[in-house]
Amino acid sequence: MKKVLLIALCFAIPMAGFAQKKKKKGAQPEVVAPVVETLSDEECMVNLSLFHESVKNKQFEEAYGFWLPVYQSRPDLNKAIYADGAEILDYRYQQITDENARKALRDSILKLHDDRIQYFDDAKYPDAYVLGLKAMDYLKYYAEDELAMPAYGWLKESVSTLGAKAQITVLRKFVEVSYNIYKSNTDQYSDQFLADYQLASATLDQIA
């Protein structure tokens, strides 16, 4: 049964990545992050509560104004800076139609993951877990990169490091991206895909 599941991961899942939401018309948010005044710890806690509540209520543009000063002042304060920040930046990305602005914002989304690794130490969600999230976002926002080599490296590190604690969605994408790379040059990448398949199979055994 496990092998059937793994084969399904390779061949039954579409290779197109993630669909983008429909672009909305109208006023668009500013892309370049404004220079904000550094907040005190007390002010950061207040803003943290405000942006978290705004995200819960899907008021993402309002949340951005509270979130950005906390992110810039105390990036080590709370995991919500990164969990909520990903939602806030994704919302802003969906509002923007200018291609250069979208490229700048998607770079900011990847940087959010880098900053989480650098500033926020979390035993429950270690660096390898965050790399999995970063890879998934790369596949979502950089869909034009057909081979997605950066995402492949992050996915492989996430799976090989986390083992039984690897996320199924990340494991699935790891096999999918590896197979896509293999298809681009079967002679060059056959050994790599076989090794990745074996790693995914062993990891799936651990999870199950």
Show where each model-derived region lies.
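Bacterial Sec-dependent N-terminal signal peptides
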Residues: 1-27, 86
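Preference for long, solvent-exposed alpha-helical segments and helix-linker "stalks"
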Residues: 20-208
